[in-house]
Amino acid sequence: MAAGKSGGSAGEITFLEALARSESKRDGGFKNNWSFDHEEESEGDTDKDGTNLLSVDEDEDSETSKGKKLNRRSEIVANSSGEFILKTYVRRNKSESFKTLKGNPIGLNMLSNNKKLSENTQNTSLCSGTVVHGRRFHHAHAQIPVVKTAAQSSLDRKERKEYPPHVQKVEINPVRLSRLQGVERIMKKTEESESQVEPEIKRKVQQKRHCSTYQPTPPLSPASKKCLTHLEDLQRNCRQAITLNESTGPLLRTSIHQNSGGQKSQNTGLTTKKFYGNNVEKVPIDIIVNCDDSKHTYLQTNGKVILPGAKIPKITNLKERKTSLSDLNDPIILSSDDDDDNDRTNRRESISPQPADSACSSPAPSTGKVEAALNENTCRAERELRSIPEDSELNTVTLPRKARMKDQFGNSIINTPLKRRKVFSQEPPDALALSCQSSFDSVILNCRSIRVGTLFRLLIEPVIFCLDFIKIQLDEPDHDPVEIILNTSDLTKCEWCNVRKLPVVFLQAIPAVYQKLSIQLQMNKEDKVWNDCKGVNKLTNLEEQYIILIFQNGLDPPANMVFESIINEIGIKNNISNFFAKIPFEEANGRLVACTRTYEESIKGSCGQKENKIKTVSFESKIQLRSKQEFQFFDEEEETGENHTIFIGPVEKLIVYPPPPAKGGISVTNEDLHCLNEGEFLNDVIIDFYLKYLVLEKLKKEDADRIHIFSSFFYKRLNQRERRNHETTNLSIQQKRHGRVKTWTRHVDIFEKDFIFVPLNEAAHWFLAVVCFPGLEKPKYEPNPHYHENAVIQKCSTVEDSCISSSASEMESCSQNSSAKPVIKKMLNKKHCIAVIDSNPGQEESDPRYKRNICSVKYSVKKINHTASENEEFNKGESTSQKVADRTKSENGLQNESLSSTHHTDGLSKIRLNYSDESPEAGKMLEDELVDFSEDQDNQDDSSDDGFLADDNCSSEIGQWHLKPTICKQPCILLMDSLRGPSRSNVVKILREYLEVEWEVKKGSKRSFSKDVMKGSNPKVPQQNNFSDCGVYVLQYVESFFENPILSFELPMNLANWFPPPRMRTKREEIRNIILKLQEDQSKEKRKHKDTYSTEAPLGEGTEQYVNSISD
């Protein structure tokens, strides 16, 4: 025993001396060469050892990427105080330090060996470790260093900010152990824990692994055994009594560039207990290293290529502090990019999932709580390893670049909302719409126009229907848009027509609403815009009591259900029975027709009202029947029987016109050809094609040189809104408009042309603008070559007497027939009796054109007289017909139908005569025109923004160019619309402004195109009787400019009978035939070209094929 004791004391003395020498060194005995030699180490070696500690592999004797094993050795030593301490030493080669990790795949900014690792961590302070009676073990509870990216490091150098201000440091009270603790017990515990886990891991990764991490130690002396027993007792007490101080204090930061090799690190805010999850929810850390290896999904960071099998710490957001226990208990894995890419198995083995090895590699003893946490983590890691599929490392996921972006704290920014295209909000931006929160309390519907009394305006914003109000925003010419708010409590009736072609709602309100609207919209009779809600005008009260909203399209079932439910709720709220009613298409169409006629009939003089009183019931019904046919918005047959067809099938190109090598060819497809079916709207391709066809095929060379036709897209592009551009901020709105189309006229000077044609499309409706004589600065009068003064005076007196006598005889002979009386009365009340020009009476009989015209008029009058009275004599009817025909021609301004000595005949007269003689249907149409025509209807509803309107009381000589010695050519803009509706003054204004800028660009000087210089007018032109032929009428307007040219441009202008309406019934088929014929011709040309240049077949065979193709 004595010898044993002496031997033990001698060993203790030797051990204490070696420990004293070790403590005297700068690194406190922790160096790269673990031995008890007396060699000194440099400060640089100490720095490198600190770096090596961070990359120590946890498996004992595990192979590195270079095939070398790590030597690990455990010893029990005693300090000068007589305490026995367990130390574990691991030697790591310097070549495996972080020097080789520069430019690693995860984008981390690793430091070289000449820099301390603490300079690149988030906190420069390291844990002070465990102190055993004055002996400080530096790496007992070392915080896992979180390495920052290069971007964060550069930011820290600029801002000196590493933590958010609310993150505070948690100080740790070191654990002090009493002397003579049971070291052997700690060894035994550690060996048992590793022997339970490592065999399972060895089976999983199928690699040879040692059952124990520690090498066998020599037998301990009895004194050492006694110390181990004491340590075991202390360990049980520590599990219950030892607690760590979690008091927080201000965060102490040191400069990231001040630490030197011998400088001691300070405490960090992460303890052993917090790291292993005992107090996870209270850990005030802002960066958590999460290495959940359950799925082995390897993500790229900072755009670097990831190595398969490399473990990347996940830097989470500040909101993710409260992490579950399982996340923090995941194994912590550190690896470098010098691992072999092809040796995945060795890499898996070298990166141990056991945190126990990492703990045991520290020279400080483990407490009971730490040991329990290690065992728990080891078991969980083993279960996760079992669930990993064998090929999981091959299945890598690559995130987009934007998803990999990080903010200044290393947090992901993929939650940043993406910039989306601007869409119209379903709720209005003002406070009124905020009251409509429920989808069944409000609905937003697209409406095309509104009519209040005789006021007609287009809408620029969708209409909002709510339980409390209806919000309408309409366009006001030359002013800012007007917003109307109708309180639903003031409504008394709502009638709804929801058919596909005419979705319209009729609202009725109390008189105060109409008065408010009259003031807000500035409605007055001087401007011929008013509403008569109080019944002052008995004839128009019914039509003017509505507030009419015409929708853009028919409502789908869900929208219709919401709309009707809102209207019903309004009726219940107002306590009005039968508040909401549905009306059929016929009634809705009739009301719209009546509203259109209301304006025209209202502006008539008292003469027109007296004339209405004289009309009989039969004649009145005939007028109403024709009015319905003329002004009906839609054909009833089309609504009830014919539906729009939808083009189905592949789109094939039919023709290119003009064909190559000509420039500016327009491609026409079979889908475009489908637009020529009855009831379909013409598209821009057909419009542009036919206008170009007219110029190139039908017009004479001199006529084509006098005109310029813009594309149907010109006005849309001119008036198109664009995003703000810094280059155009200083330009006016007129210059911005012109800039969009400035290249359209780079090869043409439009001011050298006589006519500029601009097809326009607004609200799915085609109409035509004609800029006449843009180069003239003032009206120009020229002698009328067809004017003969003597013939006019002589013929006027002769025809006037004959008209009076014949009319008187007709009065006597037809006095017994009440149905004919209105017609005769109407003729006697005319202001003028128009003369028929004829210098040579003998030429009347010899001229076949005169005979042909008289025959057609006789045919038309026969039908009139037959309708008026079957007993009327034929000669009297002939006299009446001559008078009516003469008057009709004079009032309508048909220059070509005057029978002058110059024998002037143009295209319109030929067309009219042909249609009159070909069918009885054309005669019936002429009959309707003759009966219903009245001088008071001249130039009705002509409107313009400059006030140059048609006069109601204009004489019948207006438009009679052949009765005046001069003809007028003046700059003007004519708007030809086949559906007489709103004033297009804004269109005229925009075209004027374009001409001003274009003149300045082309001529280099400024010129005014104001309303005094360039007048605007809406001439009365033939009107369509359906809702789909507007494009066809636009094409005919252009064609009639050359078939029946306008010689005098005095305003106002009446072109109501410019061309016969029956022609429009065959216009679509005419255009279709032109396209098909061009297709056939171009197909033959292609075949001819192919056969001519074919070298595969012999010459004779090729010629035969060409002949056959021509015959086909």
Swiss-Prot record:
Task: Locate the active site.
Answer: 765, 917, 1030
Q: Where is the composition biased (Low complexity)?
A: 352-366
Q: Which residues carry this modification: Phosphoserine?
A: 42, 335-336, 350, 352, 919, 1111
Q: Does the keyword Hydrolase apply?
A: yes
Q: Which GO terms describe its biological process?
A: protein desumoylation; protein modification by small protein removal; protein sumoylation; proteolysis; regulation of kinetochore assembly; regulation of spindle assembly
- A Pfam family that this protein carries is Peptidase_C48
**Pathway annotation:** Protein modification; protein sumoylation
The UniProt annotation puts the region (Disordered) at 26-71, 190-219, 329-368, 870-905, 1082-1112
Query: What EC class is this?
Result: hydrolase
Q: In which tissues is it expressed?
A: Highly expressed in reproductive organs, such as testis, ovary and prostate.
Where would you find this protein in the cell?
A: Nucleus
Phosphothreonine is found on: 416
For this UniProt record, give its keywords in alphabetical order, as a comma-separated list: Hydrolase, Isopeptide bond, Nucleus, Phosphoprotein, Protease, Thiol protease, Ubl conjugation, Ubl conjugation pathway
- Coarsely, its chief localization is nucleus
Return the Polar residues bias intervals.
Answer: 891-902
Give its E.C. classification number: 3.4.22.-
Entry-linked PROSITE patterns: ULP_PROTEASE (PS50600)
State the similarity comment: Belongs to the peptidase C48 family.
Q: What does this protein do?
A: Protease that deconjugates SUMO1, SUMO2 and SUMO3 from targeted proteins. Processes preferentially poly-SUMO2 and poly-SUMO3 chains, but does not efficiently process SUMO1, SUMO2 and SUMO3 precursors. Deconjugates SUMO1 from RXRA, leading to transcriptional activation. Involved in chromosome alignment and spindle assembly, by regulating the kinetochore CENPH-CENPI-CENPK complex. Desumoylates PML and CENPI, protecting them from degradation by the ubiquitin ligase RNF4, which targets polysumoylated proteins for proteasomal degradation.
Complexes and interactors: Interacts with RXRA. Forms a complex with KAT5-TIP60 and UBE2I in response to UV irradiation. Interacts with RPA1 to maintain it in hyposumoylated state during S phase preventing DNA repair initiation.
Protein name, entry field: Sentrin-specific protease 6
